[in-house]
Amino acid sequence: MSLFEHGVKNLHTLVKDGEVKVSELVQESFDRIDRVDGKIGAFLSLNEDAFEQAKRMDEIAKHEANPLFGLPIGVKDNIVTKGMTTTCGSKFLENFVPAHDATVVERLHEAGAITIGKLNMDEFAMGSSNENSAYKPVRNPWNTKHVPGGSSGGSAAAVAAGEVLFSLGSDTGGSIRQPAAYCGVVGLKPTYGLVSRYGLVAFASSLDQIGPLTRTVEDNAYLLSAIAGHCDMDSTSANVNPTDYTQALTGDIKGLKIAVPKEYFGEGISEGVKENIRAAIKKLESLGATVDEVSLPNSKYALATYYLLASSEASSNLARFDGIRYGVRAEADALEDVFKYSRAQGFGDEVKRRIMLGTYALSSGYYDAYYKKAQQARTLIKHDFDQVLANYDVIIGPTAPTPAFELGAQNDDPVTMYANDILTIPINLAGVPAISVPAGLVDGLPVGLQIIGKHFDEATIYRAAHAFELATGGFALPKL
């Protein structure tokens, strides 16, 4: 039996009572990575100091009250870590070693968690399959011929494969929730502004959020409790007080009002996914929740809106990678050629595609027709969510339209690839929180149930997700 099967709460008791050493947990993580990561490809680098750090922590473990003390965590490689490479899955930052930790990493270290290593991802978080990493693709632990989802594919796969107890990912249009669904783990995108973005390498600043991926809802709540809260270093950080989200895990959802958008069961959603989500809805009803069908009519504009806005923000954010200050630097005689050749050599095809799309949308002749119109559509999408959530506690539906697809199956069709995020993108545009929890299998591959909540009401999302998890069994470890 893996020590990680105990979860945060039980592991804390075992460590505090001296029945399990922190060094044993770290060693188990490294041993598991050594055994299975050759098949999965979840890690890009490992923390060479982790074991020595764990041995020092063994000596003080019995005095520590924080539930995360001594527990191993993986960090997505677009979240900066002091003294460890942060590549963003790109050759451009192959040798970049930050001088400071991101706020979320700092808070986890203060809580006693140990960073085991940095996790693979789509380059600069641009992708839905984790095939866009400049180093290696990540494979789904449930079936290594299939993708794990993206862009936080390494974060989801590492948890699903039992390499770490939990991980951090980032979510711009579904990049935590979609991989969580594909890999059968729990993944939360918090309300925009709840978790500091300081130290997250920006893709689309008005959409990006850091969040936790875990085996269970309870572990997820522990992790969010540690990283949420105001940060002076992030101008978009909300003025919210720290919260213990585990207090919401009552197992009782009697009277919970649930909305189910009819648009989330339309064309493009596989029958297997629909069947599993309808079964999940019936389960929630049997637990005492009330369910009504609603409409989010402007969701049909979400995909186009997102790719215009996110690409526009990316073209601006990635302008900083110029071959001068850090990262790849091409040899050239003229300064303009240094910029041009450095970016040509350092960026992959998908990143170049989105930079070009964003630059086009922001150009003077097309700004009103594309970028401005997309901002107007975003307002309509947000209004839809505000209206529904004024009358309901949560909105539920599938996380992804299909289970994980095979590696290489959509590489030549960017539009089909983009459509994999059609059910997660609206949530980022609205800025509301959402979680994906395991909700069955289709042909041996996991399906995710997405639970969407009101701004800064992660507690109700956790309450609903936890009750569903208790009733259905939740996480299962795939056979590797």
Swiss-Prot record:
Keyword list (alphabetical) reads: ATP-binding, Ligase, Nucleotide-binding, Protein biosynthesis
GO cellular component entries? glutamyl-tRNA(Gln) amidotransferase complex
Q: Which Gene Ontology BP annotations are present?
A: translation
- Does the keyword Nucleotide-binding feature in the UniProt annotation? yes
Q: Has keyword Ribosomal protein?
A: no
Indicate the enzyme's highest-level EC class. ligase
Q: What does this protein do?
A: Allows the formation of correctly charged Gln-tRNA(Gln) through the transamidation of misacylated Glu-tRNA(Gln) in organisms which lack glutaminyl-tRNA synthetase. The reaction takes place in the presence of glutamine and ATP through an activated gamma-phospho-Glu-tRNA(Gln).
Q: What is the protein name given in its UniProt record?
A: Glutamyl-tRNA(Gln) amidotransferase subunit A
Recorded source organism is Exiguobacterium sibiricum (strain DSM 17290 / CCUG 55495 / CIP 109462 / JCM 13490 / 255-15)
Gene name, per UniProt, is: gatA
